[in-house]
A protein has these predicted regions:
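Inter-motif core of Ras-like GTPase G domains
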Residues: 162-181
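Loop/turn-to-beta-strand initiation segments
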Residues: 105-108, 146-153, 173
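P-loop/Walker-type NTP enzyme "switch/lid" segment
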Residues: 40-142
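Beta-strand-loop-alpha "switch" segments that mediate conformational coupling across diverse proteins
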Residues: 209-250
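Conserved beta-strand segments of the P-loop GTPase G domain that flank and frequently precede/overlap
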Residues: 6-7, 38-39, 111-112, 152-154, ...
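P-loop/Walker A phosphate-binding loop and immediately adjacent motor/lid segment at beta-alpha junctions
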Residues: 131-142, 189-214
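C-terminal boundary of histidine-terminating zinc-finger modules
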Residues: 242-264
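Walker A/P-loop phosphate-binding motif and the immediately C-terminal alpha-helix
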Residues: 2-51, 137
Length: 271
């Protein structure tokens, strides 16, 4: 069991969330493991648009892992889970009651702060403020790690520095995300000697929305930063980025898996 936390190098668009979604989804399809994605944002969640239609009507998707829910219901998410934690009633196996299932027994998502305010009164808005809920994330990650094989944390800057550091400290692997532009890479290099996160052996550098035709390619970036390990990349892909806006990520990855399987079978038949 392990915690894998995705963080940004700086406050900029790096494709951090979409890189996490791609990696976690692929691992869920390829491996027989229980995986949980935790969103820590208090804004409109990109993770939600990757997997779930914005509706309260439940819809069934038939995948290779059986029936699973692809729509949102109003009880799921960090709001309900935080209430259970405050009342000291939260056990590891109860977390799944507050998640949304992408692939049954494979991949689940714990969404961040619920932005819907249609049915909230003033008292409820105060009780479910992002500041109060932020304090619960550290314990939720710790408890989730006792039940799931892998816990992916999408660490957002809306959490205060102390909470962020506590989550990072209990992480087995930290994926530091950066964009491909020179300014970001230069800042990484300048801070490398003084930044505890950059010096940690648990940290890997990842370039999201990667363009292999840029002069800042993975080979040059690795050399420029003096990295011992090759810098990881998640390439820009139009089909994937469109799927991320249409709750189409699960279907896209399943179709790609089937295509790969068919190609492999054709190759075997030819032999």
């Amino acid at each position: 069991m392990s915690v894998i936390t995705f963080v940004n190098n700086r406050k900029e668009e790096t494709g951090k969330t979409l890189s996490l979604v791609a990696i976690a989804t692929n691992m869920a399809i390829e491996n027989n493991e229980k995986i949980l994605i935790i969103s820590t944002t208090n804004k409109e969640s990109k993770i939600k648009s990757c997997f779930f239609e914005d509706t309260e009507v439940k819809k069934m998707r038939l995948g290779i892992f059986g029936q699973n829910m692809s729509a949102l219901d109003t009880e799921a998410g960090i709001d309900g889970l935080a209430k259970m934690l405050r009342s000291n009633k939260l056990n590891p196996d109860m977390i799944t009651n507050y998640t949304k299932v992408v692939f049954k027994d494979r991949l689940e998502v714990l969404l961040g702060k619920n932005k819907s305010e249609r049915n909230q009164n003033i008292e409820e808005k105060v009780q479910s403020s992002p500041i109060e809920i932020a304090d619960e994330y550290v314990e939720i990650v710790k408890i989730a790690n006792q039940y799931y094989d892998k816990v992916f944390v999408d660490l957002d800057y809306n959490l205060n520095q102390d909470i962020r550091e506590q989550i990072i400290d209990q992480s087995d692997l930290i994926i530091l995300n950066s964009s491909q532009n020179y300014k970001s890479l230069k800042e990484l290099k300048e801070n490398k000697e003084n930044n505890k996160l950059l010096k940690s052996p648990r940290t890997l550098l990842l370039i999201g929305r990667y363009d292999k035709y840029s002069k800042y390619n993975v080979k040059n970036i690795t050399r420029y930063l003096g990295e011992k390990n090759k810098v990881l990349t998640v390439p820009y892909n139009t089909l994937y980025f469109e799927a991320c806006n249409e709750a189409g990520v699960p279907d896209l990855f399943l179709k790609l898996k089937c295509m790969i399987w068919m190609i492999e079978m054709q190759f075997l038949w030819k032999k």
